[in-house]
Amino acid sequence: WHTLGKAIRMAQDIGLHRSCSNWDLPPSEIETRHRVFYACYVLDRLMGARAGKPLTILDRDFDTELPVAHEVYDDANDATPAGPSIYHSFIKLIKLSEILGRVLKALYA
């Protein structure tokens, strides 16, 4: 629980909770930032539910976009592989975690 809290604070310190789409960053770095933030988001909700603790990341406190459902490359010549990606499942997990967060807020508010 404490380690996750430190990870979330570090993510917030480097601005992972803020939209970076207009920043001058390579597409792969932007996508990595989104994925790392949402990994913290999902873990925050799962650990909060398991431990009965309040959420650290509130939905109103971030504006970063959802990750995309495919691999992102900096080189336009790299082809996106055919078939489903693991990121489809990750996005569904994020959406379920959002619902879990609302349930936890209702339970513990």
Where on the chain are the PLM-derived regions?
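Basic, alpha-helical interaction scaffolds
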Residues: 90-93
